[in-house]
Amino acid sequence: MYTIPKKTINTLDDFTLSNLELILSKDCNMACSYCFLYGDTNSGEEFIRWDDLLEMLKNINISDKLTIGLNSGELFTKERLPLVMKAMRVLKRITRYKDTTIDWRLYSNGTNFEVIRDFLIATQGERRTISISYDGEDSYRKLKGNQPSTTLDTLKRLSESGFANDIIIRYAITEKVYNMKETFDALYKLGYKNMEYYFIRNYNSYTVPLVVATFRNSLSDTLKYVKDTDIDLYNLHDYYNKQDPTVICNYGNMLVVTSDGKISTCCAVYEGIYADNVEADLLDYDRIPEIYNNFETSYIYDRSKSECAVCTNQMCKECCSYKAIGRDKYYNKRHLQQCHIRHAELAVYDSIFN
């Protein structure tokens, strides 16, 4: 059975950064349970250690193409936009010291058209993409106070302003997956072509046979529809290009920087819980080999011992990647939630594209 290839990182020179995730703050404006990954989403804590971050980046190897993801509960509010712009200004300085090109990835719930538009206008010379989460009009996503989301209105106005190609739409798989084709069709008619769907990392409904059956039928309808359009469905790249299951994070060349100035290997592992053996202060960046080796020893999932065959499925990233730090053994069997739904997914792709 396929397992994650391990990398040897004995010294700092063995490490080359190609993906950086910076958590700017923890403020979420949505009420759904799956909107944000990092536990406390209303701490108000902002990242302020810019000089220390630059010091680290100057002193480690960086790939000639660096992807920087900026994260928060919601980046695009009037209060947060100055912090986003500052992050981009400061981090661009690294190109003075390193021969690298920066691709920016930013994430949003799409609830403030004016702020997103202003950002896109101000950064037209940058290589940047905004991922906006939208699951259809009957989505579980609500604004706090159980108010309906304004995302669709934002998407309409962004498209009318000429920014559809700067945006990736991310659709979460829930019990309401029956609306996927209709949602993709509505977005396509608005001018959006960059789309993907994703599985929620911890979601018990994936074990329900009716949900799996609904997903299978809806995915089949959606893929047949996509096949006859010029929609760029990112999941299809995984089907065509991957021979083995991959992982959520780029193991061995990624760092996450938290809002309180800690560095670690992968933001997807945490979910609000941190562990001293796989994190270090920004100024202790010489410990990167140590935290990677600890991560490899303690948290990489051993797929060879898995009773869930989904670990051999090339479409799978979330399953069988890493154990969640600080969680019990039952929580860390989350990959079992996806055993059936992931194989249903692959079977649908094979039936249409193989």
Show which residues each predicted segment covers.
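Short, solvent-exposed loop/turn segments at secondary-structure junctions
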Residues: 29, 75, 111-112, 137, ...
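Aromatic-lined carbohydrate-binding surfaces of glycoside hydrolases
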Residues: 33, 76-77
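Canonical Radical SAM [4Fe-4S] cluster-binding loop centered on the CxxxCxxC motif
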Residues: 11-50
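A C-terminal junction/extension of Radical SAM enzymes
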Residues: 194, 203-271
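Flexible mid-to-C-terminal extensions adjoining Fe-S/redox cofactors in radical SAM and related proteins
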Residues: 1-3, 7, 262, 270-354
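Cys/His-rich metal-chelating microdomains
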Residues: 27, 31, 35-38, 252, ...
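N-terminal [4Fe-4S]-dependent radical SAM core
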Residues: 1-21, 62-64
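Radical SAM/AdoMet-radical enzyme domain recognition
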Residues: 41, 53-71, 78-201
